[in-house]
UniProtKB/Swiss-Prot annotation:
GO terms for biological process: modification-dependent protein catabolic process; proteasomal protein catabolic process; protein pupylation. The modification Deamidated glutamine is found at residue 64. The gene is pup. Strongly interacts with the proteasome-associated ATPase ARC through a hydrophobic interface; the interacting region of Pup lies in its C-terminal half. There is one Pup binding site per ARC hexamer ring. This is Prokaryotic ubiquitin-like protein Pup. Pathway: Protein degradation; proteasomal Pup-dependent pathway. Keywords: Coiled coil, Isopeptide bond, Ubl conjugation pathway. There is a cross-link at residue 64 (Isoglutamyl lysine isopeptide (Gln-Lys) (interchain with K-? in acceptor proteins)). Residues 21-58 are annotated as: ARC ATPase binding. Is modified by deamidation of its C-terminal glutamine to glutamate by the deamidase Dop, a prerequisite to the subsequent pupylation process. Residues 23-52 form a coiled coil. It comes from Mycolicibacterium gilvum (strain PYR-GCK) (Mycobacterium gilvum (strain PYR-GCK)). Belongs to the prokaryotic ubiquitin-like protein family.
């Protein structure tokens, strides 16, 4: 008896252009990094101006 092998294709057709998806992923990663840096800068500014108030509010809410 002969055995037949069936070759199955891997997933959808999006793998046809790996450089395009890589470039899009890199662009999204850079945008998220920039947004995260902006948010951290804003938090730093708030803490520089109101560190005492921030700590006081944090402790009042049950933080340690």
């Amino acid at each position: 008896m002969a055995q037949e092998q069936t070759k199955r294709g891997g997933g959808g057709g999006e793998d046809d252009d790996p450089t395009g998806s890589t470039a899009a992923g890199q662009e999204r990663r850079e945008k998220l990094t920039e947004e995260t840096d902006d948010l951290l800068d804003e938090i730093d500014d708030v803490l520089e101006e109101n560190a005492e108030d921030f700590v006081r509010a944090y402790v009042q809410k049950g933080g340690q």
